[in-house]
């Protein structure tokens, strides 16, 4: 067998075939080294495609790339920002996160991976990723490698200095972007404070702040986003974290916060469409809508189960 690296990994993972444990160890180490170089608010230049939650829906992630003009390649020069929640709930969290990591290694300056509330040891032990790794590898080793990568994911990205991209939302502890830049991010998602709020908070039709029903983060209102954007010279906050049936939604009359949701037919039953937000040099967002793949995760999983059942009787 020849030397295996990102090119071989990409060909394999594109077919939804998970990598060996030793390949995963090597991949996670490479990604960690790249992420260590990034700041808490990673600057990204337009043109860029912004993507919301994926939640382990691997075949829909492939559809996302088709909708956005293809996987990053030497020909496709678009930048991509992913807003977190790569894992849990879907059947192929492992393959989803692996594909994104391989693309990060191949095109480090074109793929920006932001941390979501599900990129956490505690949450993945409840919502599926831990169990998936255990089932697919027979141990928790690969889950541990991935969790180490989670700890180094950036907290935010900023497009041309004007569009802030985070997973969840704002925090009463953060008024200035510089307060995000100095947070210590190489750790498990905390239960409270600025870091926690960035991945857990939601916009709501209120004036300022309210307690979040999620039990972490806050609800923030139009006055909060208006002041935050004014102080930091921003024109828009792009975030994910909440299912929107129509794929994207602007909040508040100023339209200064937008939710981008990229998991179609969420959990294989919600019936929603998904979107990506494309931003050109004029910084005008353009949304591309896509639907779940017909022969997607469910049929692949069912076929695998049938194969296992037939093998059992051989």
Curated annotation (Swiss-Prot):
- What does the record give as cofactor? Mn(2+)
Top-level EC class as recorded in UniProt: hydrolase
Q: Which residues form a coiled coil?
A: none
Q: Where in the cell is it found?
A: Cytoplasm
Knocked-out gene: effects: Causes growth retardation and leads to significant reduction in virulence.
Q: Name one GO biological process term.
A: positive regulation of filamentous growth of a population of unicellular organisms in response to neutral pH
- List cellular component terms (GO): chromatin; cytoplasm; protein phosphatase type 2A complex
Q: Which GO terms describe its molecular function?
A: metal ion binding; protein serine/threonine phosphatase activity
Give the reactions, separated by semicolons, that this protein catalyses.
Answer: O-phospho-L-seryl-[protein] + H2O = L-seryl-[protein] + phosphate; O-phospho-L-threonyl-[protein] + H2O = L-threonyl-[protein] + phosphate
Keyword Cell division listed? The answer is yes
User: Per UniProt, which keywords does this protein have?
Assistant: Cell cycle, Cell division, Cytoplasm, Hydrolase, Manganese, Metal-binding, Mitosis, Protein phosphatase, Virulence
* CDD domains according to UniProt: MPP_PP2A_PP4_PP6
Name the Gene3D superfamilies on file.
3.60.21.10
InterPro entries cross-referenced by the UniProt entry: Calcineurin-like_PHP_ApaH, Metallo-depent_PP-like, PPA2-like, Ser/Thr-sp_prot-phosphatase
Query: How many cofactor units bind, and how?
Result: Binds 2 manganese ions per subunit.
Q: Which EC number applies?
A: 3.1.3.16
Say which domain of life the source belongs to.
Eukaryota
Q: Into which family does the record put it?
A: Belongs to the PPP phosphatase family. PP-6 (PP-V) subfamily.
Q: What does this protein do?
A: Serine/threonine protein phosphatase which is involved in the dephosphorylation of the large subunit of RNA polymerase II. Is required in late G1 for normal G1 cyclin expression, bud initiation and expression of certain genes that are periodically expressed during late G1. Plays a role during hyphal growth through the regulation of cell wall biogenesis, osmosensing and protein translation. Involved in virulence in a mouse systemic infection model.
Q: How does it assemble?
A: Interacts with MDS3.
Know the name of this protein? Serine/threonine-protein phosphatase SIT4
